[in-house]
Amino acid sequence: ELGTAYYSDHLAASGDAHQLYELFPIPFTLTEAQRVADRIAYAQDVLGCAIAVENSTYYTNVGDLRESEFLQEVVTRSNCRVLLDVNNIVVNWKNHQVESPHAYLANVDLSKVSYFHVAGHEYNPRFQMYVDTHSTHVEPKTISMAKSLSQISGKDILLEWDNDVPALAEINRGLACLNSLITSEA
């Protein structure tokens, strides 16, 4: 009815009749991958379009699969798309040292990616971890990864900035810088 190519949402837990205020991770298990894939397949049938699931940050390790393996299981079983948040891959690596960005990306089928997200993150000394705040400039490592992925796949990159949003002129300067870094040959 809306004519959209796909609908996107975070690959995170939710509940009936309850509101969760943060993106809680789904346990990274084969059982949960099948359960989630079944729900995504059903939703795609009802909506009449593909769903693109976005990888989330997680602040505790859950399950026996690596996040990329879980994501790929869900994608394969449901035939859904991926909205790949490059910043979240970096944040999860910094916090857990479980799966390097290179190892993560080796498990992702880039042909299923609809587009990429980049954002800023910050270290929170109180919690002693990095937090996906979307409140600062994107770090160079994240930009470099997104650039490589975009060049390989031909997919677009979206900048997210949700908190502590600066003046429009500052955002435009950041976008111009990001664009020049992404489009440069080096």
Task: Explain the meaning of each model-derived region.
Residues 36-39, 43, 145, 149, ...:
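Alpha-helical packing segments of well-folded alpha/beta enzyme cores
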Residues 11-12, 56-58, 87-91, 118-123, ...:
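Active-site beta-loop-alpha junctions enriched in small/polar residues
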Residues 23-33, 92-154:
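Gly/Pro-rich active-site loop or hairpin
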Residues 167-186:
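C-terminal helical cap(s) of enzyme catalytic domains, especially alpha/beta-barrels
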Residues 7, 51, 85, 116, ...:
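Conserved, mostly hydrophobic/aromatic
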Residues 61-77, 92-106, 169-172:
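Distinct, well-ordered alpha-helical segments
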Residues 1-82:
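Active-site acidic/histidine proton-transfer and metal-coordination neighborhood
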Residues 37, 41, 161, 186:
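Catalytic cores of glycan-processing enzymes that make or break glycosidic bonds
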